[in-house]
């Protein structure tokens, strides 16, 4: 069962917004588990769940890795036959660097790399923003307060987001892992979120 945007855009938009609210509720549960379990709680099952809830009733292929090509502007993500391997590497890199990288580094890497792989048919950006916040909170040891949390701030500040993605992509194309622009971007948005609470 799913709704097509072209059939009823208002209804589609309402379902999409409800899905986003449900994703944030699930994300909060995931963060609470991550605060107790640490790096072992970050796995593909959590990623599948976050993606599935984001596209429930608007896409038939939510919550599983894509099995077809996908194109994102000028970026060509890995071939679908390579997605599972790239995701294993991604998850392993997060887990192995959990206590090495700063929380903003871990979150920035997650935000960039998941977008670079683009493992899902739909809602890669929504899933990556949720993962970013999960990593930031779970690695920091706190569920940060906010009336407007980081994923919403990223969604509203697309220029900085897209610029940081492109910078990390260029570095990777040149043979370097450098997501420092993304880290600065994430840190700035977190500061703005915490400033609302005088933190």
Question: Which residues fall in each region the model found?
Answer:
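FIC/Doc superfamily catalytic core
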Residues: 1-199
């Amino acid at each position: 069962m799913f709704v097509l945007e072209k059939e009823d855009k208002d209804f589609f938009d309402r379902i999409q917004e409800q899905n986003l609210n449900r994703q944030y509720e699930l994300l909060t549960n995931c963060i609470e588990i991550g605060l107790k379990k640490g790096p072992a709680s970050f796995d593909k099952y959590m990623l599948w769940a976050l993606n599935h809830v984001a596209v429930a009733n608007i896409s038939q292929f939510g919550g599983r890795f894509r099995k077809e090509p996908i194109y994102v502007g000028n970026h060509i993500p890995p071939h679908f036959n390579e997605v599972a391997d790239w995701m294993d590497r991604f998850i392993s890199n997060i887990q192995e660097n959990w206590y090495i990288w700063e929380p903003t580094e871990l979150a920035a890497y997650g935000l960039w790399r998941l977008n670079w792989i683009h493992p899902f048919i739909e809602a890669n950006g929504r899933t990556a923003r949720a993962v970013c916040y999960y990593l930031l909170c779970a690695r920091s040891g706190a569920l940060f307060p906010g009336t407007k949390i980081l994923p919403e701030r990223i969604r509203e500040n697309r220029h900085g987001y897209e610029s940081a993605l492109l910078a990390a992509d260029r570095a990777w194309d040149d043979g370097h892992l450098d997501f420092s622009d993304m880290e600065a971007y994430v840190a700035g948005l977190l500061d703005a979120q915490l400033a609302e609470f005088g933190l």
